[in-house]
A protein has these predicted regions:
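Short, acidic/small-residue loops that bind anionic groups at enzyme active sites
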Residues: 98-124, 131-139
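Internal helical hairpin/lid segments
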Residues: 224-251
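Long, hydrophobic/aromatic-enriched structural stretches that serve as scaffold segments
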Residues: 75-98
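ATP/NTP phosphate-donor binding region
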Residues: 1-78
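Structural motif
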Residues: 81-83, 112, 243-247
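Conserved anion/nucleotide-ligand pocket segment
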Residues: 131-217
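Hydrophobic structural segments
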Residues: 123, 212, 217-219, 232, ...
Length: 251
C-alpha cells in the first residue's frame, strides 16, 4: 500500500470541495478561521476553485467541475495534502469525471474528509491501494478551542502521532450555528463501547487488522459498481485481517 508524505512545517494544505462547499454560514467563517489557524501553525494554503461555490445540487458545483477540481488537485504539485471542505449528498455523481487510473499511478497524497467523502477515502484505499484519512473536514479546524479529536487529526496529518485513543464523550446536539460558527464540540454524552463475539458479549476484546470503511450511505451506492474492488482488496491483504468502521447518516 502507498502512503502519502506527511505535512511538514511550511508545507501546503490544499482544500477542495467535491461535496458541499463553504459558501454559507457557519461553514464559511469556520473555514476562514481554519485557514488562519493553519497558517499560524506555519502552513501555506491552496484553495480549489469550488471551495466557496454553492451552485450544485448536493455538491458545490456540477459533477464535471467537482471531478475536475478533485483530480487536478490530487495530481498537482501545488499542495502536499488535501482536506475536503465538507460532506454532502451527491459526491457519487462526480466519480465518472475522475480518472482513478491516473490517481493510482500518481505520487500518493494524504486526503482527509468524512461522510460523503467516503467516495474518495474508500476508493483511494480499495481502488488505488493508497492510504487515506477518514477525519474532520476543513471548517472543523476553525473551532476554538480545538477538541482533542481535531488536534489528533492534525497530528496524524503531520506524522507526529501514530497511535490514537478514544475520547471520553461525544456530541449529540451541536451548538454551532450561523451566529456561533467556531463553537467547539458540545460533549454531553458518555462513551459506551460494546464488543461481541457472535452473540456473546466480550468484556476485554482485542482485535487487529486494516481499517477500512466509511459512510454506509455511500458504500451502498458503490456496491456492485465498477468502483467496487473490495473483493480484490480484501484478498490481497487477507493475512492482515480487517476492521470495518461504519458511519450511519440516513440509513
Amino acid at each position: 500500500m502507498k502512503y502519502g508524505k506527511f505535512l511538514e512545517e511550511g508545507g501546503t494544505i490544499g482544500f477542495v470541495a467535491p461535496s458541499f462547499g463553504c459558501n454559507i454560514e457557519p461553514y464559511r467563517t469556520g473555514f476562514e478561521q481554519a485557514q488562519k489557524k493553519l497558517q499560524e501553525l506555519g502552513h501555506k494554503i491552496w484553495l480549489g476553485p469550488n471551495c466557496y461555490e454553492g451552485k450544485g445540487i448536493g455538491i458545490s458545483n456540477t459533477p464535471q467541475l467537482c471531478g475536475k477540481e478533485l483530480q487536478e488537485a490530487y495530481l498537482s504539485k501545488e499542495s502536499d495534502v488535501l482536506i475536503s471542505c465538507g460532506g454532502g449528498e451527491l459526491m457519487c455523481e462526480i466519480l465518472d469525471y475522475v480518472d482513478f487510473d491516473r490517481i493510482k499511478k500518481a505520487d500518493p497524497k494524504w486526503y482527509m474528509g468524512y461522510s460523503d467523502n467516503t467516495n474518495m477515502t474508500f476508493l483511494l484505499t480499495t481502488l488505488c491501494d493508497t492510504a487515506s484519512i477518514y477525519g474532520p473536514c476543513a471548517p472543523a479546524f476553525g473551532m476554538n478551542p480545538w477538541h482533542p479529536a481535531i488536534d489528533d487529526a492534525y497530528l496524524v496529518l503531520t506524522g507526529k502521532k501514530r497511535v490514537l485513543n478514544g475520547y471520553n464523550g461525544w456530541e449529540k446536539e451541536s451548538l454551532k450555528d450561523e451566529e456561533h460558527p467556531t463553537e467547539p464540540y458540545h460533549i454531553t454524552e458518555e462513551k459506551v463501547l460494546h464488543t461481541f463475539a457472535g452473540a456473546e458479549k466480550v468484556i476485554h476484546a482485542q482485535m487487529q487488522g486494516r481499517l477500512i470503511g466509511g459512510c454506509m450511505d455511500c458504500l451502498v451506492n458503490l456496491t456492485g459498481t465498477k468502483y467496487d474492488k473490495v473483493n480484490e482488496f480484501t484478498e490481497k491483504y487477507k493475512e492482515d485481517g480487517f476492521i470495518w468502521f461504519l458511519e450511519s447518516c440516513d440509513l
